[in-house]
Amino acid sequence: MRNEYGEKLSRNGYAPSIMQSDLSYCYRCGRTTGKLDFHEVYGGTNRSKSKRYGLWVVLCHDGCHLGTWGVHYNAEVMEQLHREGQIAAMEAYGWTEEEFRKRIGKNYI
């Protein structure tokens, strides 16, 4: 199966990340040891869109993903990822801010 841009989806519905090409380290801190988790940049009703458009990164489990300074417990970190995801999508797919908002539901920049 492929997304509308021709990118092959994994069996779990993930297109290749447009935000991180090397998945061997944490996107935020660069950690290479310990558990690394996939993190969809836009969650909730947009989780499947994050997967389909490659708007996901790898985060270290104990720190940047679920730690007190991690994306799930720090609104500033979450907003930064949202902005970076929007910029990546606009560059990769040629979307305008309006096109992004129509697809994801909110403009983050």
What are these regions (language model features)?
Residues 56-81:
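Short Cys/His-centered divalent metal-binding micro-motifs
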Residues 36-44, 61-68:
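Histidine-centered catalytic micro-motifs
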Residues 42-56:
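Short linker/helix segments within small regulatory modules
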Residues 1-35, 80-109:
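A boundary/linker detector
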Residues 26-30, 53, 70-71:
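Short, functional N-terminal and low-complexity linear motifs
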Residues 13, 46-47, 76:
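A general structural-boundary detector
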